From Swiss-Prot:
<protein>
    <recommendedName>
        <fullName>Protein VirD3</fullName>
    </recommendedName>
</protein>
<feature type="region of interest" description="Disordered">
    <location>
        <begin position="28"/>
        <end position="51"/>
    </location>
</feature>
<keyword id="KW-0614">Plasmid</keyword>
<feature type="compositionally biased region" description="Basic and acidic residues">
    <location>
        <begin position="141"/>
        <end position="161"/>
    </location>
</feature>
<feature type="region of interest" description="Disordered">
    <location>
        <begin position="139"/>
        <end position="171"/>
    </location>
</feature>
<keyword id="KW-0192">Crown gall tumor</keyword>
């Protein structure tokens, strides 16, 4: 301020060249940064850090996934070798009527003749079933008793000898069952391959 007046001075453009002092400071900061980067590179990655993936956890997860896939593939393999007669049956609910004992359980299927082993879903997903080829199962309404001469009625006709109430021929049953087994075989092969790849990690 001179003679009661303010004087505003505009700062000129900064010098492009660095003075010796500035050049030395920049060199020191660059050296410190390179030292820090080298220290970070040489330092081993901690396996117990919550922010970084633990190698042991990844390995265990891979083994668990591999074991699970192998179990699923084995289950599919068991389903593949199950009798086609079981796969072809579309009546797998508990039997409702026994012509030998005249027992009506009020279910949705009718049992003709001998006792039928009914497929059950176990705790580990294993299917325990064995339906004899000589056993005939037919679908009926749950609120209706079969007459005593039900053997002569179309709804109790053996599907392997002709069209039953569901209208599916034995050849179509066989075709559907074979396609189902083929699809299970493909899925099982893929699961085994993925499990082997995970187990190799």
């Amino acid at each position: 301020m001179a003679n009661g007046q303010f004087t505003i001075r505009s700062a000129g453009p900064a010098s492009v060249g660095l003075t010796g002092e500035r050049r030395g400071a920049a060199s020191a900061s660059s050296s410190a940064l390179s030292n820090v980067q080298g220290d970070v590179r040489d330092r081993p990655i901690p396996t117990s850090s919550s922010r970084l993936p633990n190698a042991a956890i990844l390995r265990d997860s891979s083994e668990i996934a591999s074991t699970g896939l192998r179990y699923v593939a084995a289950t599919l393999h068991w389903s593949e070798i199950a009798p086609l007669s079981l796969i072809n049956k579309n009546d797998l609910a508990p039997a409702a009527y026994d012509f030998e004992t005249r027992n009506d359980a009020g279910n949705v299927t009718a049992k003709v003749g001998r006792a039928v082993p009914v497929p059950k879903q176990g705790r580990l997903g294993k299917m325990l079933a064995s339906v004899p080829l000589s056993t005939r199962i037919s679908r009926v309404n749950s609120d209706r008793r079969l007459p005593t001469d039900a053997e002569n009625h179309p709804e109790t006709r053996d599907p392997r000898k002709g069209r039953g109430s569901h209208g599916v021929t034995p050849a179509l049953h066989e075709k559907i069952g074979t396609a189902f087994v083929r699809r299970l075989r493909k899925i099982r092969t893929v699961l085994f391959a993925v499990a082997a790849r995970l187990g190799a990690r």
